């Protein structure tokens, strides 16, 4: 597998991005890493690069404050655009970027393109509960149709089998305001009908926000606006809970003694919810394995993201296309 890495994308680029890519290259000797970036910024960091790392020159990064489409039109040599074109040409099989999320999505749609039968892509992220749950969409498609949510469920099911290594068919839930089939707005009710009728989906029914980590569903689908709000809320609540625990334990001598005794378990909890364990979120629905990293990704997060691509990305697009085609055949639909 060959992975194009946007070496200039992210708050800690290029140092942390390159360091993580080099660590992944050593960990995965059968994977070729194509670092994409300005030679003057990247080459000095490659003195000890293993043989499966190479540099592909590009212009600068798309900044976080830039409008993605306008930036790509005005600067087609931007690092994320060059990386996406490597996937389109077949020189790379996958793309990783920790830069501007909108730019990564736009470059993927513009240069790589959507897979057959998929009108809109979805960003899928793993919620690190005691029962890890795949949530999609978390930001690629803010406004959805019911058919899009069905497609997300199919994409997520295929991906969860590979990435989460679920036993049997992953159970899919529809994020809603209640468990009953008639709950929610028109979109939710129509999506519920389509999901319940699909032979490609093991539908578990509606799932409320409080049940995301309960194990009722392995995959939960929603529109990108709601999914992004859920993700950011979960991240904020996790940080606040850790802060409150730390404050309570360190506020007294007895608490500090207890904290010292519990330190290994507290660190294990902190590490469990650390997004660096996964390193990024897959953009499903495009003709390549695309992973969007966190803007503040460190070398550890980049390494884990590239390892995730190597584990789940091989043959992913072909399987997604085949599964969507079976759904279209079963429903009598032609491509969206």
From Swiss-Prot:
GO terms for cellular component: cytoplasm. Homodimer. Probably interacts with PlsY. Its EC number is 2.3.1.274. It catalyses: a fatty acyl-[ACP] + phosphate = an acyl phosphate + holo-[ACP]. Belongs to the PlsX family. NCBIfam families: plsX. Pathway: Lipid metabolism; phospholipid metabolism. This is Phosphate acyltransferase. It comes from the Bacteria.
């Amino acid at each position: 597998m060959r992975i194009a890495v946007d070496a200039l994308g992210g708050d800690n680029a290029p140092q942390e991005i390159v360091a993580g890519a080099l660590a992944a290259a050593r960990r995965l000797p059968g994977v070729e890493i194509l670092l994409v970036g300005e030679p003057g910024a990247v080459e000095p960091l490659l003195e000890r690069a293993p043989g499966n790392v190479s540099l592909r020159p590009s212009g600068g990064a798309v900044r976080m404050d830039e409008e993605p489409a306008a930036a790509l039109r005005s600067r087609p040599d931007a690092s994320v655009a060059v990386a996406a074109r490597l996937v389109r040409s077949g020189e790379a099989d996958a793309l990783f970027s920790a830069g501007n999320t909108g730019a990564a999505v736009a470059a993927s749609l513009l240069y790589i393109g959507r897979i057959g039968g998929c009108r809109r892509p979805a960003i899928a992220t793993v919620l690190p509960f005691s029962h890890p749950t795949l949530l999609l969409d978390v930001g690629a498609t803010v406004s959805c149709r019911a058919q899009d949510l069905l497609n997300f469920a199919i994409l997520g099911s295929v991906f969860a089998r590979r990435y989460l290594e679920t036993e049997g068919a992953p159970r899919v839930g529809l994020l809603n305001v209640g468990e009953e089939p008639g709950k929610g707005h028109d979109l939710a009710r129509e999506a519920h009908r389509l999901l319940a009728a699909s032979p490609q989906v093991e539908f578990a029914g509606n799932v409320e926000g409080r049940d995301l980590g309960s194990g009722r569903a392995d995959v939960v689908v929603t529109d990108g606006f709601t999914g992004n709000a859920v993700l950011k809320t979960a991240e904020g609540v996790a940080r606040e809970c850790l802060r409150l625990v730390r404050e309570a334990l360190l506020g007294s001598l007895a608490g500090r003694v207890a904290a010292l005794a519990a330190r290994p378990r507290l660190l294990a909890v902190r590490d469990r919810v650390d997004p660096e364990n996964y390193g990024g979120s897959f953009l499903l629905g495009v003709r390549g394995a695309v992973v969007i990293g966190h803007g503040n990704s460190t070398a550890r997060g980049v390494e884990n993201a590239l390892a995730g691509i190597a584990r789940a990305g091989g043959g992913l697009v072909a399987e997604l296309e085949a599964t969507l085609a079976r759904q279209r055949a079963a429903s009598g639909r032609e491509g969206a």
